[in-house]
Amino acid sequence: GDTSKVNPLSPVDLVIDHSVTVDHFGDDDAFEENVRLEMERNHERYMFLKWGKQAFSRFSVVPPGTGICHQVNLEYLGKAVWSELQDGEWIAYPDSLVGTDSHTTMINGLGVLGWGVGGIEAEAAMLGQPVSMLIPDVVGFKLTGKLREGITATDLVLTVTQMLRKHGVVGKFVEFYGDGLDSLPLADRATIANMSPEYGATCGFFPIDAITLEYMRLSGRSDDLVELVETYAKAQGMWRNPGDEPVFTSTLELDMGDVEASLAGPKRPQDRVALGDVPKAFAASAELELNTAQRDRQPVDYTMNGQPYQLPDGAVVIAAITSCTNTSNPSVLMAAGLLAKKAVTLGLKRQPWVKASLAPGSKVVSDYLAQAKLTPYLDELGFNLVGYGCTTCIGNSGPLPEPIETAIKKGDLTVGAVLSGNRNFEGRIHPLVKTNWLASPPLVVAYALAGNMNINLATDPLGYDRKGDPVYLKDIWPSAQEIARAVELVSSDMFRKEYAEVFEGTEEWKSIQVESSDTYGWQSDSTYIRLSPFFDEMQAQPAPVKDIHGARILAMLGDSVTTDHISPAGSIKPDSPAGRYLQNHGVERKDFNSYGSRRGNHEVMMRGTFANIRIRNEMLPGVEGGMTRHLPGTEAMSIYDAAMLYQQEKTPLAVIAGKEYGSGSSRDWAAKGPRLLGIRVVIAESFERIHRSNLIGMGILPLEFPQGVTRKTLGLTGEEVIDIADLQNLRPGATIPVTLTRSDGSKETVPCRCRIDTATELTYYQNDGILHYVIRNMLN
């Protein structure tokens, strides 16, 4: 065949940011050591990506150790308006974007319409397929007033997230307007736009205005581009004028003067908690964990570096300044540095059990912290640079020191992580950390000093100065004037310097040699990259869709099941199906790497499907982790093992779930994995947008229970057998009768709604998935 047909039709930038792990921390060598380990562990994957760079046109690679894709996009790649020569004339048109990470929405802060899609949908878009969707409602969010002294952009975004989740914006666009935008810096806008997936919207859009242009100049964009953006936006009616009141489907309003210092946790980004209420929220979550308020967890003795310590219940064991959400924002980074400076000056120290780290989304952050002379103070408190990448925010927090891990297990302690990230789902940050809290960078530093979630930072001392006097948060919190003076040190020269060689990479990256070829040379013994089975039995023409007969329920799940629950990205347990597979193929435990790094190997990923250590399958009450029953038997076994038994029996499978199924990351393996396990249908109360699309893209049918009907109202046990007929005549949005046969032989038919929303999606489903459809189109 003609391999040149398989080439992107639109410009594609691949930014490598998800692989660096915080193995080393707390010293000046941490960055170099983590980069060395990243290159060592991921050498084969990086060879594959480098091969792709030379094999495809319109395809650029930003090497590892450079930054986080959304921050690199905001600071450098995004244009706001594109221009190109067509038929001898220059044409200008709005920038737009889809990305394979849900936080792609960050670019909406720059006035660029963009959102996350699954990898399979992105691959199809690269090859010329349209991104189809129902015309969305547009919710207007009016911002008025200004943030008060001491309140950060992080506090604002956590408040916005809570409000919009409550309002209900899944599948909708959100546009921000109001006089509050007149003084809202672009970095704050980007923080709010970044967390669109957390509030459930397809995007959170900020229109182009003078503040947009100011940021483009600061970040080193050319004068010609800035002039084009202004001229084009004004000519096309895309320019925001003060006082504009667009027409929206619905609206809500926030006076930014009402925003208070906040965290979100312990396991959902929308669960905002006022700073003074954190100890109470932590205690409630710890009691829930115990199922009793009676048990008193005592501190556990441990020794580290020859010193005896006690690890208390509620200890903050991870404090991470991480994630593009906040490290793209100079005001909160400078605030963290200034707070660190005041703390060090007074003699405060990080608690010895806290693993602290600083992982910015771009090298510019290091430049301006150094320019402000704040780096030494962050280093003194253990917030040394550990990498330029996602790290803790995506679960690459690395191991805790061995004495800490042992103490947590010994005392069955409920401990916490505080991070400046965007997600805090169960089991995501670290397997032993049961509560995870989102906070601004200065609060991350403050919690590293306090070291305990039970300490009320609004009223209790963080520690004691050299004289023994108590030091409170208010004593070291920087003023708005101090922060503003520090932010003035950020210059366009910093951006130009760091992005001048953004595609070059380190010497280690440059030294990777690849074969010049249009086709990849698969290695049969590779445990990282294997030829996937998704095209194994594909025919030139799609077969008619088969009805679902005699399907068994593989898992019955509750509300807010995330793609992290379905396909975790973090560490691989040695005694899990994926861990056993790797060991059987000669991989030592120290070389397991993460599920995220093994995504090129379907054997690992299908074994990791539903393998999150915190997932709860209601078919096995009281059991945590990826376990189920192989029906009609009663024995508990891993979901993977049960699925393989069902495949031997040729039994199709179903998943039953509650509200917001598939929220979180745009992780396509959360659809690919279930497909390989034999799942044909997912029936839920509601779906998150990207995951619903991914399921269809892999030929899995998403169905919604009718309003008011749930697995609980139906009294489902998971032992039911499911039949769904007449799938050849499926229509978008149609009502589909689902027949449930209970273990006593009684039957009930439930009219479910087909969540294939568009004719294009139906075509993908009828082709057994989007990739089959694209390949068939190419063959024709």
Language-model features, listed with the residues they occupy:
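Fe-S-dependent hydro-lyases/dehydratases of central metabolism
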Residues: G1-N780
